[in-house]
C-alpha cells in the first residue's frame, strides 16, 4: 500500500487561505497555497490598510490555534476599540471604549504579514493566476481528482481543493452558478498619514478607534491605523451599479473626485464643515501619496444571503468565496478564519482516521462526510451573519442612520 500524503491545494492567499495553510502545517499536513498576486514586499505590508476586529470564538481562536498569539498581540495597538457616532451636523450621538468582550483591532496588512512569515515559504506559490478548476474521477484509483489550470504555469492535480479565492472566486464556478450581486452602495477609500501631527483637529474628530458619521443614506467612516493614519471610507447609497461611470468619476484622482462628493446636494454638500474638511483632506492626501493614481472608488458586492451549493467530493469553499457579505456585521474575516479553523480540524480528523497507509480514494471516503457537515455548519452561521449584515446596512445607510446606529450600540 502506498504511504498517504494527500495532495491538498488552497486557492487564494488571503486571511482564510493563509490561516488554513498555517493550521495544517501545525498539524504536519502538507498543503500548497496558490495565490494570484506577487509576494508582497515589506514596504507594501507596512502601508496603512483596513482594520479588522477579531472575535473570541473565531478570529482569536484561529490565532491561538495557529500558534501566533504572542506575535498577534505584538502587532496590535494601531487602532483602539473605541467608537464614535456622529450625525451629518457633526453632533456626537454616542461614544464608547469597546464592549465587555475584547475585540482587538489588527490591520489587514499586519495580519497578512503575520501569516506569511509563519508559513514555510515553499508552501506558497505566488503569481499563479487560475484559468479554470475541473473535477473528474480517476478510473484507475476511483478517487476524485481536482485539476487546476493556470494561465502561465503547468496544470496541477490535487485530491482536495479549498477555494479561498475571494469575491470573484474561480473555484466557486465549479460548485455554484451564483455571481456576487451589487449591494446598493459605492465606497471611496482614502488615507491620511501622520494625522496627529499633520491634522490634530481631524485626529481629535476621528478619535483613537472607529468613527461613523451617518445620515441621508450616506456615510463617512474612519479607522485609525499604522503610521498614525486615518483611513476614510466615504459610502454612497445608490441603486446605480455603474454610478462611477454615470457621474464621471472614472480615471479621476481622489483629489478630483472630492469635488463631486462635496458639491452634490444628495451627497456631502450640506454636511458639517468639520466632516467636509475630513473628506477633502483625505482625498488630497491620498493623491499626494499616490500622484496620478485613480481614486479607489468602487461598488460593493455580496453573495445572495443564504448562498449554498450542492456538495461535491474533493472540493469546498471558505471565506468570501463561500459567503461574501457586506461589512456591516464585522464578521467577514472572522467567519473566514472560523472556516479555516474548522476545515483544518476536519482534514486532520480524516488523516487520523485512515492512518499512514491509505490511498487517495480511502482518504476521500473518510473525509467526504466530514466536509459535508463542515459545509452545513459554515453556511448556516454565514447565512445568519449575512442576514444581520444586510439588515444593518439598510438600518445604518438610512435617512437617520446616525440615530439608529447610536441606538444599536446603546442596546448592545
Language-model-detected regions and their locations in the chain:
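A structural signal for isolated positions on well-ordered beta-strands in alpha/beta enzyme cores
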Residues: 9, 32, 231-233
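Histidine-centered metal-chelating micro-motifs
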Residues: 168-169, 189, 218-221, 322-323
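Eukaryotic N-terminal low-complexity, Ser/Thr- and Lys/Arg-rich leader segments
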Residues: 1-8, 19-28, 121, 138-150, ...
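Conserved FAD/dinucleotide-binding core of flavoprotein oxidoreductases
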Residues: 94-97, 102, 107, 112, ...
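Conserved N-terminal helical subregion
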Residues: 2-8, 23-25, 49-195, 243
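Conserved mid-domain beta->alpha element of the FAD-binding
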Residues: 9-30, 37, 162-163, 188, ...
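A short beta-to-alpha transition loop/helix N-cap that caps and shapes the active-site region
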Residues: 40-44
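Short, solvent-exposed loop/turn segments at secondary-structure boundaries
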Residues: 46-47, 175-176, 246, 329-332
Amino acid at each position: 500500500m502506498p504511504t498517504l500524503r494527500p495532495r491538498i491545494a488552497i486557492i487564494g492567499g488571503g486571511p482564510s487561505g493563509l490561516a488554513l495553510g498555517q493550521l495544517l502545517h501545525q498539524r504536519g499536513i502538507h498543503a500548497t497555497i496558490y495565490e494570484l498576486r506577487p509576494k508582497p514586499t515589506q514596504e507594501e505590508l507596512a502601508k496603512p490598510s483596513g482594520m479588522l476586529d477579531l472575535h473570541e470564538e473565531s478570529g482569536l481562536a484561529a490565532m491561538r490555534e495557529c500558534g501566533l498569539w504572542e506575535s498577534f498581540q505584538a502587532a496590535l495597538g494601531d487602532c483602539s476599540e473605541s467608537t464614535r457616532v456622529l450625525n451629518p451636523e457633526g453632533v456626537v450621538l454616542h461614544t464608547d471604549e469597546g464592549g465587555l468582550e475584547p475585540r482587538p483591532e489588527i490591520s489587514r496588512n499586519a495580519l497578512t504579514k503575520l501569516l506569511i512569515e509563519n508559513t514555510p515559504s515553499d508552501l506558497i506559490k505566488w503569481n499563479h493566476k487560475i484559468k479554470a478548476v475541473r473535477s473528474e474521477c480517476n478510473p484507475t484509483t476511483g478517487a476524485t481528482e481536482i485539476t487546476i489550470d493556470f494561465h502561465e504555469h503547468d496544470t496541477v492535480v490535487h485530491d482536495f481543493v479549498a477555494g479561498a479565492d475571494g469575491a470573484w472566486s474561480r473555484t466557486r464556478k465549479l460548485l455554484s452558478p451564483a455571481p456576487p450581486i451589487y449591494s446598493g452602495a459605492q465606497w471611496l477609500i482614502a488615507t491620511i498619514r501622520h494625522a496627529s501631527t499633520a491634522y490634530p483637529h481631524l485626529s481629535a474628530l476621528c478619535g483613537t478607534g472607529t468613527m461613523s458619521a451617518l445620515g441621508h443614506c450616506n456615510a463617512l467612516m474612519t479607522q485609525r491605523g499604522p503610521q498614525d493614519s486615518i483611513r476614510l471610507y466615504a459610502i454612497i447609497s445608490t441603486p446605480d451599479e455603474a454610478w462611477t461611470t454615470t457621474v464621471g468619476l472614472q480615471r479621476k484622482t481622489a483629489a478630483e473626485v472630492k469635488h463631486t462628493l462635496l458639491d452634490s446636494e444628495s451627497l456631502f454638500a450640506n454636511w458639517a464643515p468639520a466632516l467636509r474638511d475630513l473628506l477633502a483632506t483625505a482625498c488630497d492626501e491620498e493623491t499626494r501619496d499616490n500622484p496620478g493614481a485613480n481614486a479607489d472608488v468602487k461598488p460593493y458586492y455580496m453573495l445572495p444571503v443564504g448562498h449554498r451549493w450542492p456538495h461535491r467530493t474533493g472540493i469546498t469553499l471558505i471565506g468570501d468565496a463561500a459567503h461574501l457579505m457586506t461589512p456591516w456585521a464585522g464578521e467577514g474575516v472572522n467567519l473566514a478564519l472560523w472556516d479555516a479553523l474548522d476545515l483544518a480540524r476536519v482534514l486532520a480528523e480524516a488523516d487520523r482516521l485512515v492512518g499512514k497507509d491509505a490511498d487517495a480514494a480511502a482518504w476521500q471516503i473518510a473525509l467526504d462526510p466530514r466536509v459535508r457537515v463542515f459545509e452545513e455548519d459554515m453556511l448556516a452561521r454565514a447565512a445568519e451573519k449575512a442576514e444581520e449584515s444586510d439588515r444593518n446596512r439598510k438600518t445604518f445607510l438610512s435617512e437617520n442612520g446616525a440615530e439608529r446606529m447610536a441606538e444599536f450600540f446603546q442596546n448592545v
